[in-house]
From Swiss-Prot:
UniProt keyword annotations, A-Z: Nucleus, Phosphoprotein, RNA-mediated gene silencing
Amino acid composition bias (Basic and acidic residues), ranges on this chain: 8-33, 40-49, 284-308, 340-361, 388-419, 474-493
Chief localization: nucleus
Positions carrying Phosphotyrosine: Y79
Naturally occurring in which organism (per UniProt): Drosophila melanogaster (Fruit fly)
Bias-annotated ranges (Basic residues): 362-371
Compositional bias ranges of the Low complexity kind: 642-653
GO terms classed as biological process: defense response to Gram-negative bacterium; mRNA splicing, via spliceosome; negative regulation of viral genome replication; primary miRNA processing; regulatory ncRNA-mediated post-transcriptional gene silencing; siRNA processing
Name the UniProt record assigns to this protein: Serrate RNA effector molecule homolog
Gene disruption phenotype: Lethality.
GO CC terms, sorted: catalytic step 2 spliceosome; nuclear body; precatalytic spliceosome
Domain of life of the source: Eukaryota
Record region (Disordered): 1-100, 284-493, 637-662, 851-886
Length: 943
């Protein structure tokens, strides 16, 4: 059983196979004598502790595969010297990322066999690597090789860089070359990142000379619309009537919803929906009673001749789900099939009124559509019809208004069925008897209700016709028949009215309530237009928002798709999950509504001193954001304004708050920034602030200051999407499902507060708002030149030279057109005349790259952990005292913690104490010992 599969599996799991495989090829023949007939090294049996009976002679032992057969192709890279014959030390399990703990990536910081230091010594002499003793770990080398990895490749530190230079180089020359190396390294990383992401939409929206302008104009349009809405609410007193306190949560939510309705294009009539009780959302979930109702319908079919119509109720139950499936290109065909029976029914009803002789034909068509209209005349059918209607209402939880419309339609269908059954009579007699004989046709009413729900869910604009009929009470038959053929005409006009609330004339629309889907996984190559093309298949689609990519998610993005409130959002989500964009699963899930829209902040914010500080900070933030987007600028942005902005940004903040701004919210704001105190009175009365500091003082509210602050806070929240009390900004909020969704307000105040607490709170809060207080100034031309900025004319010249090829003497080729010329000057003229668009693309590419460099907050890969931790780790190791180590490679540990001046003492490792001192030249403290004064002097006494 020695050669069983279990033995091979055990060998495959052997954790020391890497070490044995790495040094077996060099020293097996020298270590053991070759015995028996096994002259070749491959015939030697391995020393396996699990093979007790295997002989080492190898004569009768069967040849077994090598370890590498189980490990896959490729040999494991060995970090030791290839000329050493000693086996490497026991390999500890690596902990990737702890580069400052271990001496070598393969061997841990703790060397159990105390051989690694000497191996490192010889490795520095005979290493084949360019930097002795510094082969990068496997994962680091793999991670640094790609252009789109999580971190940049590791940059050489000064000691590693010195190993690549001549030994006779001076210190000043070393520092100059190392500075050039770091600059070139940074330029290379920026250029590689730009090349890797320049074709992605999110990157173009930030820096492309054309796309970025369009995006900024779009955002400025959003902000201008928000500003208009805020000014309208400020003038009519809506803003001034609310306090940003958590106790007034309902009033704050009403103000935010009012803004959303106005942003959606709503009117004052639509604002009345805020006074109404919010309606329950439309639920389209299928229940278990659905199949029971289908079975009951099948039981009512008595004639076998009518089996052809059995698919009708089943298909009508599936129709509400069909528009939201992924393959919904044939909705028009379904609508045409549904509208055709309606037109036939309308024509048949007309003929039944005017021509009594067509009664039999009318009966046939009615039977074909409604399946069994003449067999259910008993009272039991009425009870079954009512129970079916109740089950239908439970299955489709629609609004009360829609249920009333369905009942009205069912009543009219009963009247039509009664007329068709009783024969030709006058219209008045039909109407009078139709009101009395409403008991039969229970199955017909149920099927009609199915069809009405079908038509309402698939094309809600058709539901406007029952409303017109119900307004007239009973309504004449001529009006009803005249409305149905005009459905096609009305459909063209009302294609946008998907919301049921919009169809109802004269009723407010709940524009602030939406349904949404969250996309967890969007590849960087997916564009907004591709997502919109997928979402446009579903009814009720409004907009899509795509977040900026995240480096920790490998530049994958998240997205939110917004639909109208009354759509079947779960069916749409299911349809999106069955689709892939560019071979990427979007991971669509239903986005829940916001749980708490008003969230409390620290109650100390209501204190008068804190309120005055908040007014100052809010004014600075509002002024900076207004200047950034030029909201209140009278004319185009000129050089003088930009220069003044640069000067104020260098000082950290603008010196004026309301003087140079046309914003009415910032007018006369300095009147509230001047602090007042009774200093003289306190001095005369001998009052000091010691008691206040120890015992604290009660919260002092100044309603006038609070009203000014609330106006500023609401301005920042509504216009700039900045939640001041949460010190954050909600990005791309105009495209999100919930505009103005969350706001933080002042919470319940504490009983007493000390002056130290107030000052500490103000200081900490100001530090949290630094991202809004400091202006983002683009880098200057000199700064981007150091980062590798390109010149447009130089790049155009390179483009011309690259497209000028010499074939022979006096024969030149232009690869762009394939034409041949006698000289390069003719090709140059040809390119500028015939390929001007190519030259413009080169200039745009240069501007594209320079725009990326000008952004001080440009996206880029984070630095390698070894690069960022290097200054601390080197000082922690104790390495230093010169540029070049005398003979040992850096970061090597000597046996038993012996440390010369150039080396760090100790074996390292997190779970091992530092090694004992051997009394080097500089010891930590003076050692105290006992010395007998009568004893002779010797060299063993302590100092």
């Amino acid at each position: 059983m020695g050669d069983s599969d279990d033995e091979y599996d055990r060998k495959r799991r052997d954790k020391f196979r890497g070490e044995r495989e790495s040094y077996r090829t060099e020293r097996r023949d020298d270590r053991r004598p070759v015995g028996g007939s096994a002259g070749a090294r491959d015939e030697w049996a391995e020393r396996n502790p699990f093979r007790g009976g295997a002989s080492a002679g190898g004569g009768g032992a069967r040849h077994r595969p090598d370890y590498s057969d189980y490990r896959g192709p490729g040999a494991r890279p060995r970090y030791g010297s290839p000329v050493r014959d000693l086996p490497p030390a026991k390999r500890m399990r690596p902990d990737w990322g702890d580069g400052d703990v271990r001496a070598n990536p393969r061997f841990g910081g703790y060397d159990p066999y105390l051989m690694q230091a000497w191996n490192d010594h010889y490795q520095s002499m005979h290493s084949a690597y360019s930097h002795g003793g510094h082969a990068p770990p496997v994962r680091e080398s793999i991670g640094g090789g790609g252009g789109d990895t999580l971190t940049q490749p590791a940059m050489l530190n000064l000691k590693q860089f010195l190993d690549t230079q001549d030994e006779n180089i001076s210190d000043s020359e070393v520092m100059r070359k190392y500075t050039e190396y770091k600059t070139d390294f940074k330029r290379q990383q920026l250029n590689e990142f730009f090349v890797a992401h320049k074709d992605e939409e999110w990157f173009k929206n930030k820096y492309h000379p054309e796309d970025s302008v369009k995006r900024s104009e779009e955002q400025r349009g959003f902000l201008q619309r928000r500003t208009d809405v805020f000014m309208e609410l400020l003038e009519n007193g809506t803003i001034g009537s609310v306090k940003v306190d958590s106790s007034q949560a309902d009033a704050l939510i009403r103000v935010l919803d009012t803004c959303v309705i106005k942003l959606e294009g709503g009117t004052d009539e639509d604002l009345k929906v805020l006074d109404e009780k919010p309606k329950d959302p439309v639920v389209y979930e299928r229940k278990a009673e659905q199949m029971q109702s289908v079975k009951e319908v099948e039981k009512t079919i008595n004639s076998p001749k009518e089996e052809m119509s059995e698919a009708d109720p089943v298909s009508t139950q599936r129709k509400p789900v069909r528009p939201v499936n992924s393959d919904g290109e044939n909705w028009d065909d379904d609508d045409a099939e549904n509208s055709a029976p309606k037109k036939e029914l309308a024509e048949d009803s007309k003929d039944s009124d005017s021509k009594p002789e067509d009664k039999q034909l009318n009966k046939k068509k009615t039977k074909k559509r409604k399946r069994n209209s003449s067999d259910d005349d008993s009272s039991s059918s009425e009870s079954s019809s009512s129970s079916d209607e109740e089950k239908l209402k439970e299955k489709y939880d629609v609004e009360d208004g829609l249920r009333a419309e369905q009942k009205t339609e069912a009543e009219k269908d009963r009247q039509e069925a009664t007329k068709a059954k009783q024969g030709p009579q006058s219209p008045k007699l039909d109407e009078d008897e139709g009101n009395e004989n409403t008991e039969p046709k229970g199955l017909d009413s149920k099927i009609n209700t199915y069809e009405e729900i079908d038509n309402t869910l698939k094309s809600p604009e058709i539901s406007s016709n029952p409303i017109k009929n119900t307004d007239n009470g009973d309504g004449s038959k001529v009006e009803e028949d005249g409305e149905k053929p005009s459905v096609g005409k009305d459909k063209v006009v009302e294609t946008e009215t998907i919301d049921l609330d919009k169809v109802k004339d004269g009723q407010p629309r709940a524009l602030h309530r939406t349904s949404s889907i969250f996309l967890r996984n969007l590849a960087p190559s997916i564009t907004r237009s591709e997502i919109e093309a997928v979402c446009n298949r579903f009814s009720g689609y409004l907009r899509v928002a795509i977040a900026d990519p995240l480096v920790e998610r490998r530049w994958y993005r998240r997205g939110w798709i917004t639909f109208m409130r009354d759509v079947n959002i779960k069916e749409i989500c299911w349809g999106l999950n069955n689709q892939r964009l560019r071979d990427c699963e979007m991971g669509a899930i239903v986005n829940r509504d916001l749980s708490r829209r008003v969230r409390p902040a620290n109650g100390i914010t209501a204190h008068k001193q804190v309120v005055r500080s908040d007014i100052k900070l809010c004014a600075k933030i509002a002024l900076n954001l207004d200047e950034k987007f030029r909201l209140w600028a009278e004319g185009p942005k000129d050089d003088s304004n930009s220069a003044r902005a640069n000067e104020s940004s260098e000082n950290g903040s603008g010196s004026t708050y309301g003087f140079n701004s046309q914003n009415p919210v910032l007018q006369n704001i300095t009147d509230y920034l001047i602090e007042e105190a009774s200093a003289e009175e306190e001095e005369l009365l001998g009052l000091t602030g010691e008691n206040k500091d120890t015992e604290g003082e009660p919260i002092e509210r100044d309603e006038q200051l609070i009203s000014v602050l609330d106006r500023l806070v609401l301005y920042l929240r509504i216009v700039h999407s900045v939640d001041y009390y949460n010190h954050c900004e909600y990005p791309y909020e105009d495209e999100m499902p919930n505009r103005c969704g969350i706001i933080h307000a002042r919470g319940p105040p504490p009983v007493r507060v000390t002056n130290n607490d107030v000052q500490e709170y103000i200081k900490i809060y100001e530090s949290k708002l630094q991202q809004f207080l400091t202006k983002t100034v683009p880098l200057s031309d000199e700064e981007i030149k150091n980062l590798g900025a390109k010149d447009a004319e130089t790049e155009v010249e390179k483009f011309v030279q690259a497209n000028t090829q010499e074939l022979a003497k006096d024969k030149w080729l232009c690869p762009l057109s394939g034409k041949k010329f006698k000289g390069p000057e003719f090709i140059r003229k040809h390119i500028f005349n015939k390929h001007e668009e190519k030259v413009d693309e080169v200039r745009k590419e240069v501007q594209y790259f320079n725009n990326y460099l000008r952004d001080p907050k440009r996206p880029q890969l984070p630095e390698h952990p070894g690069t960022s931790k290097r200054p601390e780790s080197e000082s922690a190791r104790g390495g230093g005292g010169g540029y070049r180590p005398p003979m040992y490679p850096p970061f090597s540990a000597m046996p038993y913690g012996f440390g010369p001046p150039m080396m760090g003492g100790g074996r390292g490792g997190r779970n091992f104490p530092p090694a004992r001192r051997e009394l080097p030249l500089e010891h930590q403290r003076r050692l105290i010992g006992y010395h007998d004064l009568d004893a002779p002097a010797n060299s063993d006494m302590f100092d």
